[in-house]
């Protein structure tokens, strides 16, 4: 059986006139649309029912046949087929043109395909097409050249000179069509290849371009003359609707206007031709027809766009596809879905981790069909119709049925913007009164939600498979780790942290200190009877059964710690249980802050898995809220104690500043030095005041507790509250040398307040800009890596990628352990001192093994990496390593490309926008933050370029009056000299030994230079470590593998330099794997292989260079991508996610992969035993 949606690839091509007539159901001859009196379509018009089908279901135009029983009959009076009105969305018409016209995409695009294949300049072509010049089609015996242009005067002169029939020249699309018809593609191809061998420079580039177009036509089976249109397709009327507004006027799609102009001009041209009008009039009409067709296909591409009322350019066919509002992005990639709702969220601290509160009315509407079915099943309603009536009238018994339906049916909750995959999670719904959705406090971090009016959307998974996936893969209790770095995302925040911190504090000299209790229960009783303070240091006797033997002893602790440890598994490894005296100790015997809570959760997850962790989290949440309430931790101005030392510190600094000013006035130091010194002084003073403040705060001071626990606020905020605000920047980002000496507690004066506003306002402006930039970066990253899916277990590569710790100066930015854990080594790792093999090649390394390797003093390790993966499509599981979100090995079918893009894009909003000023005048601005990440991923030439050594050797410095020169002497004694401009900072010293690609001066390096000097591995390394530096400086951890996925996509193309005996064209870009394949085939035949070199593409270019034209067209430059694809007759293999979403198929990832879809289920009931079904505890 042929299913419409069951195909493996999609091809695009040029439509021949025959094809267009074949699609069509009839010719549109009149420009009329709808008769405004009868509101029925005019016959042969743009909405004609005979061509496109009936307006009403099962009803012909004249009303002779009505009802479904006449299905398929064609009315003998009006010629309309009796069928569903839906066919008006799919039936096409056509317009037969009186004169051929050119297709603007192929004539006007860059490069002009028509111009290249004819070897005419686009300007010359334009003159011919728009009737400004004649082109010689056949010079016959005359000295004129073929394709030579003649203006009106020259044409007349030539005719006078050589006679009427002595040569053939014409103008307009007819002439171009004749020329295109005459092209012999095979012959042209051979000739161009011959020419290519001898030509150089600009001429060679032009020949390569022409050859590319000729080969595209030759291989695709498209004919060049199809670029000139004889017949225009008319799209179905329901895709360009016309609706009546109140008041009797009509609103219509712009396309109808554009079609109408084409039909009007075409009919006028036919009439003129029949009348045998003078040439000049006909020519003018043909030109107008050409312009009308241009406007229909792509309005505004040539000349001024055709405008509608109010000077608004009309939306042409191309505009319907382009941009955010176009067909691709608006309707194919982002559809609205049924069974969904949205509402405001409120906090639900009483919920379990996997639950959410769903408002009753909303649930009833969302689960309506399920409730109706259940009502019938339970015998509460006789048929679906009465069940529907019951639900709509909300009868009391409906609620019980709803509870029953909802009990095991998960729902998906989503909060926009969905920046990473944790932006949609599944929950078990619980019915709640009111109209707000209740959300568990621990999932707020993942959603980045708060309860100040945020809204969330609910979606109901309908099929059993969808419900199963939601429950097992998307349940909030299973998504505890962040996919970007594998750290817990469900970490308690704010009150929960404060409560836990409060519980685990201890205090000297409080009630009950030093008491001894017989068991933990007695401690709790004493605490509840207020006989002992929660922070009192007490002793308690504990009993434990370990390996069958009972151990008891006395431990020192506090009631708070006993309470806190009730919810913590006692085997997380914080305490070394092998030591006898530690066997009874409480696991968490320290002050708990947000950071340590993260560690506890991480250890619990690694040791006990998701279910136990989510139970522990719920207990910590409950205790945290309870005890932060009991602790009654509040803020008041009396908690902000201004430190005693502040006045003295300020006076001292002012004296020193005065000294510096004096030195400046006397000319001992320059203006810059003075400024630098003053800034340094005030920075240090602000620090000193802050330190004095922190020292003077009591550990039970509520503000201190909030900051120290990580619940809210930070040291710098406390500094501003009670210390001093310190230095501020002016609007241009330069630091003002007068600091704000007051704190908020003391109050700011007018000038201080005014200076503060600069920073605040700039911050707000920055944030707004940053959000948009960050979103766009994410979109490009998704597009470049969306087809990277884990497609096989092992690609069998022998290669590896060498990693070592990433350093910035002396500071370690990313240690080796982090780079190794969750990876496979590509060769045996051997201990350099003992010579034993620590890890065999292709063995999985967890964190412990990675630590062993690092502790053995090994500095560099070769690991399997996405960079060296040999899978043609996607990556293999071995090269990818561990799945960060589960800390298990990655499964086949995981969409690692999208996860990588989200992991890099999601923290984008946290990166700063500003460019930092380095000290000194001539220090070039170093771009950092988001712009730097973008610069790296787009492989742009950075601002503030560093000078890079092209060779390895020893540094020799020379300084003359005019300039500084650095000479690098290679081992062969060859000298390469570099002139250093004054003001740039030199990174090397005399006598240093440097290698090729090292920086001589400070600044950023152009990645293309690194590719040239150090090769492809060098540039991959550089991009990886540079991007990591930007993120790590902002305290964002991203695992290397995500960056590797994107960088691999940037370095996948090879630029052909010499085609050898292959079919490849020099100067074109081709996928590395296709290149190797082509060479392998040629070598087997004994031919000469092609030569090429890896090209580094920015993410935008790389996304547009993908094999899939659907994915590229839906990304950017839609018309250019489609023009190119159509000429080449490209086939989209539908391997990525985007293209499958566009055509409405399941994505080839996860359970949508063919290997999972084509599983056959054998139902052999006898083999299935009841007790073998594991009960799954949620």
UniProtKB/Swiss-Prot annotation:
DNA-dependent RNA polymerase catalyzes the transcription of DNA into RNA using the four ribonucleoside triphosphates as substrates. It comes from the Bacteria. CDD domains: RNAP_beta'_C (cd02655), RNAP_beta'_N (cd01609). It comes from Clostridium botulinum (strain Hall / ATCC 3502 / NCTC 13319 / Type A). The gene is rpoC. Mg(2+) binds at residues 450, 452, 454. It holds the Pfam family RNA_pol_Rpb1_3. This is DNA-directed RNA polymerase subunit beta'. Its EC number is 2.7.7.6. The RNAP catalytic core consists of 2 alpha, 1 beta, 1 beta' and 1 omega subunit. When a sigma factor is associated with the core the holoenzyme is formed, which can initiate transcription. Keywords: DNA-directed RNA polymerase, Magnesium, Metal-binding, Nucleotidyltransferase, Transcription, Transferase, Zinc. Zn(2+) 2 binds at residues 795, 869, 876, 879.
């Amino acid at each position: 059986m042929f299913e419409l949606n069951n195909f493996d690839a999609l091809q695009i091509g040029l439509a021949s006139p025959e094809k267009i007539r074949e699609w069509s159901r009839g010719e549109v001859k009149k420009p009329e649309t709808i008769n405004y009196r009868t509101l029925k379509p005019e016959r042969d018009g743009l909405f004609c029912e005979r061509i496109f089908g009936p307006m009403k279901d099962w009803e012909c135009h004249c009303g002779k046949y009505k009802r479904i029983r006449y299905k398929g009959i064609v009315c003998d009076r009006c010629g309309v087929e009796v069928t569903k009105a839906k066919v008006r969305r799919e039936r096409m018409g056509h317009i037969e043109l009186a004169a051929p016209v050119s297709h603007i995409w192929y004539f006007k695009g860059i490069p002009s395909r028509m111009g290249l294949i004819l070897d005419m300049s686009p300007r010359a072509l334009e003159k011919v097409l728009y009737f400004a010049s004649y082109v010689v089609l056949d010079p016959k015996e005359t000295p004129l050249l073929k394709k030579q242009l003649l203006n009106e005067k020259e044409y007349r002169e030539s005719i006078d000179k050589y006679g009427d029939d002595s040569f053939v020249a014409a103008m307009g699309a007819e002439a171009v069509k004749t020329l295109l018809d005459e092209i012999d593609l095979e012959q042209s191809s051979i000739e161009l290849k011959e020419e290519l061998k001898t030509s150089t420079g600009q001429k060679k580039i032009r020949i390569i371009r022409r050859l590319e177009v000729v080969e595209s036509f030759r291989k695709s089976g498209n004919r060049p003359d199809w670029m000139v249109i004889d017949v225009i397709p008319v799209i179905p009327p329901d895709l360009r609707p016309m609706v009546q507004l109140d008041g009797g006027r009509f609103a219509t799609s712009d396309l109808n206007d554009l079609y109408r102009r084409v039909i009007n001009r075409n009919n006028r041209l036919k009439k003129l031709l029949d009348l045998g009008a003078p040439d000049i009039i006909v020519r003018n009409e043909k030109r107008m027809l050409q312009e009308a067709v241009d406007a229909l296909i792509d309005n505004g591409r040539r000349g001024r766009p055709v405008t509608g009322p109010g000077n608004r350019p009309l939306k042409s066919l191309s505009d319907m596809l382009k941009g955010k509002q176009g067909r691709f992005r608006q309707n194919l990639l982002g559809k609205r879905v049924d069974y969904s709702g949205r509402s405001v969220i409120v906090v639900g601290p009483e919920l379990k981790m996997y639950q959410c509160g769903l408002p009753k009315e909303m649930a009833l509407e969302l689960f309506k069909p399920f409730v109706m079915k259940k009502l019938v099943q339970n015998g509460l309603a006789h048929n679906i119709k009465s069940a529907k009536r019951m639900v709509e009238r909300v009868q009391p018994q409906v609620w019980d049925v709803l509870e029953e339906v909802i009990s095991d049916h998960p729902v998906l909750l989503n909060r926009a913007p969905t920046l990473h995959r944790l932006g949609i999670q599944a929950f078990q719904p619980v019915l709640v009164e009111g109209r707000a959705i209740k959300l568990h406090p621990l999932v707020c971090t993942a959603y980045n939600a708060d309860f100040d009016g945020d809204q969330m959307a609910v979606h109901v998974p309908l099929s059993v498979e969808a419900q199963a996936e939601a429950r097992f893969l998307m349940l909030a209790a299973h998504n505890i780790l962040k996919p970007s770095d594998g750290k817990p995302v469900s970490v308690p925040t704010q009150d929960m942290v404060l409560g836990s911190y409060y519980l685990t504090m201890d205090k000297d000299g409080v009630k009950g200190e030093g008491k001894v209790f017989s068991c933990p229960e007695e401690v709790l009783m004493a605490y509840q009877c207020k006989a002992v303070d929660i922070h009192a240091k007490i002793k308690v006797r504990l009993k434990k059964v370990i390996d069958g033997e009972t151990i008891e002893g006395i431990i020192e602790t506090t009631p708070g710690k006993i309470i806190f440890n009730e919810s913590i598994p006692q085997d997380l490894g914080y305490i070394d249980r092998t030591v006898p005296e530690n066997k009874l100790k409480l696991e968490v015997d320290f002050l708990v802050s947000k950071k340590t809570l993260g560690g506890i959760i991480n250890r619990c997850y690694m040791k006990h898995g998701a279910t136990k962790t989510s139970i522990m989290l719920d207990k910590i949440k409950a205790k945290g809220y309870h005890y932060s309430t009991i602790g009654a931790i509040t803020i008041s101005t009396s908690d902000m104690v201004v430190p005693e030392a502040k006045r003295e510190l300020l006076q001292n600094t002012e004296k020193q500043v005065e000294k510096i000013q004096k030195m400046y006035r006397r000319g001992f130091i320059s203006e810059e030095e003075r400024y630098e010194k003053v800034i340094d002084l005030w920075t240090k003073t602000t620090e000193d005041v802050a330190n004095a403040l922190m020292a003077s705060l009591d550990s039970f001071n509520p503000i201190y507790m909030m900051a120290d626990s990580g619940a809210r606020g930070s040291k710098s905020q406390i500094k501003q509250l009670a210390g001093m605000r310190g230095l501020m920047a002016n609007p241009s980002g330069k630091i003002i040398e007068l600091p704000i000496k007051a704190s908020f507690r003391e109050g700011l004066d007018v000038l201080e307040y005014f200076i503060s506003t600069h920073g605040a306002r700039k911050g707000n402006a920055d944030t707004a800009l940053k959000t948009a930039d960050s979103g766009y970066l994410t979109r490009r990253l998704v597009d470049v890596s969306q087809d990277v899916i884990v497609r096989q277990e092992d690609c069998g590569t022998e290669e590896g990628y060498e990693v070592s710790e990433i350093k910035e100066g002396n500071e370690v930015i990313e240690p080796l352990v982090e780079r190794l854990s969750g990876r496979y080594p590509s060769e045996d790792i051997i201990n350099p001192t003992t010579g034993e093999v620590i890890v065999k090649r292709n063995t999985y390394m967890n964190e412990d093994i990675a630590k062993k390797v690092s502790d053995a003093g090994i500095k560099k390790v070769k690991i399997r990496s996405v960079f060296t993966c040999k899978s043609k499509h996607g990556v293999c599981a071995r090269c990818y390593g561990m799945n960060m979100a589960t800390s298990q090995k990655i499964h086949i079918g995981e969409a690692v490309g999208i996860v990588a893009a989200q992991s890099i894009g999601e923290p984008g909003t946290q990166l700063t926008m500003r460019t930092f000023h380095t000290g000194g005048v001539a220090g070039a601005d170093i771009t950092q933050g988001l712009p730097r990440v973008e610069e790296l991923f787009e492989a742009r030439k950075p601002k503030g370029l560093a000078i890079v050594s092209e060779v390895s050797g020893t540094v020799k410095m020379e300084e003359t009056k005019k300039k500084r020169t650095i000479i690098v002497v290679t081992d062969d004694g060859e000298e390469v000299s570099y002139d250093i401009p004054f003001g740039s900072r030199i990174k090397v010293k005399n006598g240093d030994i440097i290698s090729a690609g090292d920086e001589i001066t400070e600044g950023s390096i152009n990645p293309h230079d690194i590719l040239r000097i150090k090769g492809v591995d060098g540039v991959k390394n550089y991009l990886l470590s540079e991007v990591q530096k930007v993120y790590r400086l902002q305290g964002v951890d991203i695992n290397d593998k995500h960056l590797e996925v994107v960088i691999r996509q940037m370095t996948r193309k090879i630029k052909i330099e010499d085609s050898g005996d292959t079919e490849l064209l020099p100067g074109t870009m081709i996928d590395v794997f296709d290149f190797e394949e082509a060479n392998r085939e040629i070598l087997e035949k004994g031919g000469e292989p092609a030569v090429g070199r890896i090209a580094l593409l920015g993410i935008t270019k790389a996304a547009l260079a993908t094999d899939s034209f659907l994915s590229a067209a839906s990304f950017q430059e839609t018309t250019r991508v489609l023009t190119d694809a159509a000429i080449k007759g490209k086939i989209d293999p539908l391997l990525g996610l985007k293209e499958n979403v566009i055509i409405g198929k399941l994505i080839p990832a996860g359970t949508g992969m063919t290997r999972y879809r084509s599983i056959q289920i054998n139902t052999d009931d006898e083999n299935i035993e009841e007790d073998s079904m594991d009960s799954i505890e949620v």
